[in-house]
Structures are given as C-alpha cells and as structure tokens.
Amino acid sequence: LGDVYKRQIMFPGGFSAGDEPDGSAKFFATAFQNAKMKEAVEKLLNERDGLALGICNGFQALIKLGLVPEGKIVEQNAKSPTLTTNRIGRHISKVAYTRIASNLSPWFNNVHVDDIFSIPVSHGEGRFVASEQELESLIAAGQVATQYVDFSGNPSMDIRFNPNGSMAAAEGLMSPDGRVLGKMGHSERFVPGLMKNVPGEKDQKLFKSGVEYFR
C-alpha cells in the first residue's frame, strides 16, 4: 500500500477469465473495494494530488468503482453510468479516430481540444451508456474527454467510426477535477515506427504529461 499511497495508479487493459464478462475490471473493482485499498486511493487523490489512469479494462474498473465520473470510490446502482457490450455484440479490433473533446485533465497537458488521433481499440465491452441527464451533465462539465469521430472530425454514431456505439461517441471520461482519466483506446500501444500504413497522429503524450505533472 505504500507504493499506492505515493504515486500514480495505472489500471491497464488485459484479458482475464476469458474476458467474459467485464474482463479483469471485476477483479480490479473487487480488490479496490477493500477498506485499506480504498483509503489509500482516496488519500492519493485527495491529499497527495495524485493521478489515476485506466485503459480499456482499466477504464471499466474505474467506472465500476465510481472513480470516473465521480472522482471517488462509490457504490454503483442500476442508474450509474457503465460500459457494456459493443452494439454489434462481439469483440472489435481496429484503429479509430478520436478527438480531444476536453483537455482539463493533467493527462492531456500536451494536447489541445479538437486534436485528432489514430488510436488502436480492442474490446468486447466498450459501449458507454448513461442517462440523458447524466450525459448532458458530463458534457457540460467537460468530463467527456475524448470522442470517436469521422473523417471530418465530427463525433459519430456510425459504426465505421464509433466501433462500440458509445453514447455521445464517448471514448474517454474523466473525474470532475480531471486527475482520474479512463479511456477505451490503447494509447499505450503507440511505438515510433509502428502502424506506418495508418495515417494520422498516434502519440497522445499521455505518459509524458503524467510525468511532467509531478515536476
């Protein structure tokens, strides 16, 4: 717990138990409901100005814990925002175009609103669902961090561009203060020289921003 108390927390993607259902998110969520783990996370975020990032299954874990969009670990109910099965009912794996909709998060200190990136996505349960009221509130607060967009940079519900059918074309969400970020796209898969045949910018500089935040 000492390490959790002192630094950033990263919830990575990764299959577990056949990835059905909820992938490794269910195990993350169970572990972090532990009273001592919960206390350590809350102290990290509230007292030590820490950061947390969840990608793919890690994003699912953040949603299940309430860290996004609430910014704290809270009990979930049937009306809580969630990530559920892709609209096509199966796993998808492709490169999607995503737009920075809000850069209020320290994780996005090196990008600008309306920047567009080509980001790998690979998941079976990435469709963001929330009530209309909740969705409007998140958009108004700038908590919808990234969106799936078409070739013109417009948020899209077209399956060619929004592969899971997320409401508001949401690909990533953040906590109210931006220090907790969850996203479905695998920004960590960027390596210089990789995906040479795929057009577009691929480096969101997430980890560069995360390091610079503490300097």
Report residues per predicted region.
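Short, small-residue-biased leader/transition segments that mark boundaries at the very start
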Residues: 1-5
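Beta-sheet entry/capping signal
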Residues: 8-9, 49-52, 178-181
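Generic, low-specificity signal for short hydrophobic/alpha-helical stretches with a mild N-terminal bias
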Residues: 10, 23, 44, 80, ...
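Cysteine-nucleophile active-site neighborhood
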Residues: 16-106
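C-terminal and late-domain segments of enzyme folds
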Residues: 95, 100-215
